[in-house]
UniProtKB/Swiss-Prot annotation:
InterPro entries: ATPase_NBD, Methan_mark_12. It comes from the Archaea. This is UPF0285 protein MM_0679. Coiled coil: none annotated. Belongs to the UPF0285 family. It comes from Methanosarcina mazei (strain ATCC BAA-159 / DSM 3647 / Goe1 / Go1 / JCM 11833 / OCM 88).
Length: 325
């Protein structure tokens, strides 16, 4: 039986196939996916996974914020691709839209995974914020759950930073990219950013997308930053030190929430910056505990695991209700 998970990432669309014990992965850049037809998207899936569309049992999709619904459900029951609005925090390329529509229109059985927001079953105090995390982070969390962990915090650090807490196998809260810890490109709006928005110099979304640690440096993107850090350049190391400090703060805050639920748990790091050894060591030192690192594929693999287990009849995933079939 073949199950596929799709991670709508910041820079790429990542796909994972679970077929028995076999796990395969591939990715399409978001701009690359946007330039493809729906037919070409499906052909890529067939080619990379050596599987026919008709033989796919279930696909689990993530799309953008996922704030228009709160249950895992059939994509046919989703309106507006599961969004309250197409506006929001992040860059629009059209790649995620192309993949979502290709799967929805293909006839392949598919479910959509929601993000966490005010209508989700999380700690009610977290609902002071309208949005907590986008759907692919639940894929990461479910992959960790399938590894045997019931209590944990995971921080996904890349273009932005999002941290999520799971207690007794249920997600209880998360801190979204625009709330606290900065990533490389994105971060919360500070005083200067708010003034720039009020003065019409930036939209709020532009300010968010320019609020990451990269603004402290002369580098133009994440690749340049990480290469410079490998060469020991001071501005790059300061940026990574900054990201590490605030990510550690975010992890500690979620660990505090775990304690209120009577548990303690492991700390995981994910994302292209979270898997950098320098960052791992810094955060582990801040926390006083070893952090376990995940690669960039775990969101897609976790989503494929959700597809597999929903197909097998699971009614709840990480405490989230399932409305399928």
């Amino acid at each position: 039986m073949a199950f596929i998970g799709v991670d709508h990432g910041t820079t790429a669309m990542r796909f994972a196939l679970i077929e028995g014990e076999k796990v395969l992965t591939f990715e399409l850049g978001r701009s690359e996916a946007a330039a493809m037809s729906e037919k070409e998207i499906l052909e890529s899936i067939e080619k990379e996974f050596e599987v026919k569309v008709k033989d796919i049992d279930l696909i689990a999709l993530t799309y953008s914020m996922g704030d228009g619904f709160s249950e895992i459900k059939d994509v046919k029951k989703i309106e507006g691709r599961g969004l309250q609005s197409t506006e929001g925090a992040g860059k629009k390329t059209g790649g995620g839209t192309r993949v979502f529509d290709a799967v929805k229109n293909s006839g392949i059985p598919a479910i959509a995974i929601p993000g966490l927001h005010t209508r989700s079953k999380v700690d009610p105090r977290m609902k002071v914020f309208s949005h907590l995390t986008s759907p692919e982070k639940l894929g990461i969390a479910y992959h960790i759950r399938c590894m045997g962990y019931k209590d944990f915090v995971v921080s996904d650090i890349s273009s932005n930073t999002v941290t999520l807490a799971v207690a007794s196998g249920k997600v209880i809260g998360a801190i979204d990219a625009c709330i606290f810890a900065p990533g490389v490109h994105h971060g919360p709006l500070d005083l200067e950013a708010i003034r720039n928005v009020d003065d019409g110099l930036r939209t709020a979304n532009q300010a968010f997308m320019e609020a990451g640690a990269l603004k402290m440096t002369p580098y133009k993107d994440r690749g340049e930053l990480l290469n410079a850090a490998e060469n020991g350049e001071e501005p790059a190391l300061l940026a990574l030190d900054t990201i590490s400090l605030f990510a550690a703060m975010e992890i500690v805050s979620m660990q505090l929430l775990l304690k209120e639920y009577g548990v303690t748990g492991a700390a995981f790091l994910a994302g292209s910056v979270g898997e950098v050894e320098y960052v791992q060591k810094k955060i582990s030192r801040h926390l006083g505990q070893e952090c376990l690192s995940l690669g960039k594929w775990h969101a897609a693999i976790g989503c494929a695991g959700i597809a597999r287990d929903v197909f097998a009849g699971e009614n709840h995933i990480l405490g989230i209700d399932v409305d399928y079939p």
